[in-house]
Protein backbone atom coordinates (compact mmCIF):
# COMPACT_ATOMS: atom_id res chain seq x y z
CA UNK A 1 0.00 0.00 0.00
CA UNK A 2 3.03 2.27 -0.12
CA UNK A 3 6.39 2.62 -1.85
CA UNK A 4 9.22 1.67 0.45
CA UNK A 5 12.85 2.58 -0.11
CA UNK A 6 16.35 1.64 0.91
CA UNK A 7 18.46 4.77 0.62
CA UNK A 8 21.97 5.93 1.30
CA UNK A 9 21.95 8.10 4.41
CA UNK A 10 24.93 9.81 5.96
CA UNK A 11 25.93 11.67 9.09
CA UNK A 12 26.73 15.18 7.90
CA UNK A 13 29.14 15.79 10.79
CA UNK A 14 31.63 13.52 9.03
CA UNK A 15 31.88 15.77 5.98
CA UNK A 16 33.20 19.34 6.07
CA UNK A 17 33.25 19.87 2.31
CA UNK A 18 31.66 17.79 -0.41
CA UNK A 19 28.97 15.38 0.69
CA UNK A 20 28.52 11.88 -0.76
CA UNK A 21 26.26 11.28 -3.73
CA UNK A 22 25.06 7.86 -4.77
CA UNK A 23 26.22 4.31 -4.32
CA UNK A 24 29.54 5.05 -6.02
CA UNK A 25 30.52 7.32 -3.14
CA UNK A 26 29.27 4.79 -0.61
CA UNK A 27 32.00 2.47 -1.87
CA UNK A 28 34.68 5.18 -2.06
CA UNK A 29 36.36 5.20 1.33
CA UNK A 30 39.34 7.14 -0.03
CA UNK A 31 37.27 10.15 -1.04
CA UNK A 32 34.79 9.73 1.82
CA UNK A 33 36.49 8.00 4.77
CA UNK A 34 34.57 6.38 7.57
CA UNK A 35 32.76 3.20 8.48
CA UNK A 36 29.78 2.01 6.46
CA UNK A 37 26.70 0.03 7.40
CA UNK A 38 24.17 -2.11 5.54
CA UNK A 39 21.53 -4.70 6.28
CA UNK A 40 23.02 -8.16 6.77
CA UNK A 41 20.69 -9.69 4.22
CA UNK A 42 21.53 -10.64 0.63
CA UNK A 43 18.25 -9.52 -0.93
CA UNK A 44 18.23 -6.16 0.86
CA UNK A 45 19.56 -4.37 -2.22
CA UNK A 46 23.21 -4.49 -1.15
CA UNK A 47 24.22 -6.59 -4.17
CA UNK A 48 22.38 -4.27 -6.53
CA UNK A 49 24.03 -1.25 -4.88
CA UNK A 50 27.46 -2.84 -5.34
CA UNK A 51 26.85 -3.50 -9.01
CA UNK A 52 25.48 -0.02 -9.66
CA UNK A 53 28.53 1.44 -7.92
CA UNK A 54 30.69 -0.74 -10.15
CA UNK A 55 29.18 0.76 -13.29
CA UNK A 56 26.39 -1.65 -14.18
CA UNK A 57 23.38 0.11 -15.70
CA UNK A 58 20.10 -0.33 -13.79
CA UNK A 59 18.39 -1.93 -16.78
CA UNK A 60 21.23 -4.47 -17.07
CA UNK A 61 21.35 -5.63 -13.43
CA UNK A 62 19.50 -8.92 -13.86
CA UNK A 63 20.42 -11.67 -13.77
CA UNK A 64 22.67 -10.44 -10.96
CA UNK A 65 26.38 -11.09 -11.32
CA UNK A 66 26.72 -12.14 -7.69
CA UNK A 67 30.46 -12.73 -7.82
CA UNK A 68 31.08 -9.29 -9.29
CA UNK A 69 28.92 -7.75 -6.56
CA UNK A 70 30.83 -9.57 -3.84
CA UNK A 71 34.13 -8.52 -5.39
CA UNK A 72 32.98 -4.91 -5.17
CA UNK A 73 31.90 -5.46 -1.57
CA UNK A 74 35.37 -6.81 -0.85
CA UNK A 75 36.68 -3.27 -1.34
CA UNK A 76 34.85 -2.06 1.78
CA UNK A 77 34.31 -5.30 3.68
CA UNK A 78 36.61 -4.27 6.52
CA UNK A 79 34.75 -0.96 6.86
CA UNK A 80 31.22 -2.40 7.10
CA UNK A 81 29.29 -2.73 10.34
CA UNK A 82 26.29 -4.87 9.47
CA UNK A 83 22.93 -3.97 10.98
CA UNK A 84 20.18 -6.48 11.66
CA UNK A 85 17.34 -4.27 12.95
CA UNK A 86 16.04 -0.90 11.86
CA UNK A 87 16.73 0.63 15.25
CA UNK A 88 20.33 -0.53 15.06
CA UNK A 89 20.83 1.16 11.69
CA UNK A 90 19.42 4.41 13.06
CA UNK A 91 21.65 4.26 16.13
CA UNK A 92 24.80 3.61 14.10
CA UNK A 93 24.10 6.64 11.93
CA UNK A 94 22.87 9.12 14.49
CA UNK A 95 25.70 8.34 16.92
CA UNK A 96 28.28 8.90 14.22
CA UNK A 97 29.71 5.40 14.60
CA UNK A 98 29.36 5.08 10.84
CA UNK A 99 29.57 7.85 8.30
CA UNK A 100 27.15 6.28 5.81
CA UNK A 101 24.59 3.51 5.78
CA UNK A 102 22.08 1.90 3.47
CA UNK A 103 18.88 2.15 5.50
CA UNK A 104 15.12 2.12 5.22
CA UNK A 105 14.07 5.65 4.40
CA UNK A 106 11.87 5.83 7.50
CA UNK A 107 14.94 5.33 9.68
CA UNK A 108 16.90 7.98 7.84
CA UNK A 109 14.14 10.55 8.19
CA UNK A 110 13.71 9.72 11.88
CA UNK A 111 17.32 10.76 12.45
CA UNK A 112 17.17 14.04 10.55
CA UNK A 113 17.31 16.05 13.78
CA UNK A 114 20.59 14.31 14.62
CA UNK A 115 22.40 15.47 11.50
CA UNK A 116 21.49 12.55 9.26
CA UNK A 117 20.80 13.36 5.61
CA UNK A 118 19.38 11.24 2.80
CA UNK A 119 20.79 11.12 -0.71
CA UNK A 120 18.40 10.20 -3.51
CA UNK A 121 20.96 9.83 -6.31
CA UNK A 122 20.45 6.05 -6.20
CA UNK A 123 17.97 4.04 -4.17
CA UNK A 124 16.32 0.67 -4.31
CA UNK A 125 12.79 -0.49 -3.71
CA UNK A 126 10.89 -3.75 -3.55
CA UNK A 127 7.35 -4.49 -4.61
CA UNK A 128 4.73 -5.24 -1.97
CA UNK A 129 1.15 -6.34 -2.44
CA UNK A 130 -2.12 -6.57 -0.59
CA UNK A 131 -3.62 -9.97 -1.35
CA UNK A 132 -6.72 -11.94 -0.50
CA UNK A 133 -5.96 -15.69 -0.53
CA UNK A 134 -8.06 -17.84 -2.80
CA UNK A 135 -10.88 -19.39 -0.81
CA UNK A 136 -10.73 -16.79 1.96
CA UNK A 137 -13.86 -16.92 4.11
CA UNK A 138 -14.20 -13.15 4.41
CA UNK A 139 -13.26 -12.11 0.90
CA UNK A 140 -15.67 -9.18 0.65
CA UNK A 141 -14.60 -7.73 3.99
CA UNK A 142 -10.95 -8.17 3.05
CA UNK A 143 -11.47 -6.30 -0.22
CA UNK A 144 -13.25 -3.50 1.63
CA UNK A 145 -10.35 -3.29 4.07
CA UNK A 146 -7.83 -3.02 1.22
CA UNK A 147 -9.92 -0.32 -0.42
CA UNK A 148 -9.98 1.57 2.87
CA UNK A 149 -6.23 1.26 3.45
CA UNK A 150 -5.41 2.56 -0.03
CA UNK A 151 -7.71 5.59 0.00
CA UNK A 152 -5.87 8.96 -0.17
CA UNK A 153 -6.70 10.12 3.35
CA UNK A 154 -5.58 6.88 4.98
CA UNK A 155 -2.38 6.70 2.94
CA UNK A 156 -1.44 10.28 3.75
CA UNK A 157 -2.17 9.71 7.43
CA UNK A 158 -0.08 6.53 7.47
CA UNK A 159 2.88 8.52 6.14
CA UNK A 160 2.98 10.44 9.45
CA UNK A 161 3.90 7.22 11.22
CA UNK A 162 5.82 5.43 8.47
CA UNK A 163 7.26 7.95 5.99
CA UNK A 164 7.17 5.89 2.83
CA UNK A 165 5.62 7.07 -0.41
CA UNK A 166 1.87 6.60 -0.87
CA UNK A 167 1.03 4.41 -3.84
CA UNK A 168 -2.22 6.30 -4.44
CA UNK A 169 -1.21 9.40 -6.39
CA UNK A 170 -4.17 11.31 -4.99
CA UNK A 171 -2.64 11.02 -1.52
CA UNK A 172 0.58 12.82 -2.40
CA UNK A 173 -0.84 16.33 -2.00
CA UNK A 174 -2.22 15.38 1.41
CA UNK A 175 1.12 14.25 2.88
CA UNK A 176 2.50 16.11 5.90
CA UNK A 177 4.54 19.04 4.64
CA UNK A 178 7.64 18.14 6.65
CA UNK A 179 8.15 15.07 4.45
CA UNK A 180 7.39 16.62 1.07
CA UNK A 181 10.35 16.45 -1.26
CA UNK A 182 11.92 13.66 0.78
CA UNK A 183 9.68 10.69 0.11
CA UNK A 184 10.23 7.87 -2.40
CA UNK A 185 7.39 9.17 -4.56
CA UNK A 186 9.32 12.43 -5.01
CA UNK A 187 12.29 10.59 -6.54
CA UNK A 188 10.89 7.79 -8.68
CA UNK A 189 13.20 8.80 -11.54
CA UNK A 190 16.26 7.54 -9.63
CA UNK A 191 14.73 4.35 -8.24
CA UNK A 192 16.04 0.88 -9.02
CA UNK A 193 13.23 -1.62 -8.54
CA UNK A 194 14.46 -4.97 -7.28
CA UNK A 195 13.39 -7.89 -9.44
CA UNK A 196 11.18 -9.92 -7.11
CA UNK A 197 10.72 -12.70 -9.65
CA UNK A 198 14.48 -13.19 -10.00
CA UNK A 199 14.92 -13.18 -6.23
CA UNK A 200 12.11 -15.70 -5.73
CA UNK A 201 13.93 -18.10 -8.04
CA UNK A 202 17.45 -17.47 -6.75
CA UNK A 203 17.27 -16.35 -3.12
CA UNK A 204 18.20 -19.66 -1.48
CA UNK A 205 21.32 -19.98 -3.63
CA UNK A 206 22.37 -16.35 -3.23
CA UNK A 207 21.72 -16.34 0.53
CA UNK A 208 24.06 -19.29 0.91
CA UNK A 209 26.78 -17.64 -1.18
CA UNK A 210 26.40 -14.39 0.76
CA UNK A 211 26.77 -16.18 4.08
CA UNK A 212 29.87 -17.94 2.78
CA UNK A 213 31.32 -14.58 1.76
CA UNK A 214 30.60 -13.06 5.17
CA UNK A 215 32.57 -15.85 6.84
CA UNK A 216 35.59 -15.56 4.56
Summary of predicted features, one role per range:
Residues 1-94:
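Extracytoplasmic ligand-binding site segments that recognize negatively charged/polar headgroups
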Residues 7-14, 51-55, 127-139, 146, ...:
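A bilobed periplasmic-binding-protein/Venus flytrap-type ligand-binding module shared by bacterial periplasmic
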Residues 29, 76-79, 92, 96, ...:
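Structured segments of extracytoplasmic/periplasmic soluble domains
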Residues 29-43, 66-75, 112-136, 149-172:
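Periplasmic-binding protein-like
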Residues 89-92, 108, 142, 155:
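Short, hydrophobic alpha-helical packing/hinge segments within bilobed ligand-binding/sensory domains
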Residues 94-95, 100-116:
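A ligand-binding cleft/hinge motif common to bilobed small-molecule-binding domains
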Residues 156-216:
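C-terminal capping/gating helix-and-loop segments adjacent to ligand/active sites or protein-protein/ligand interfaces
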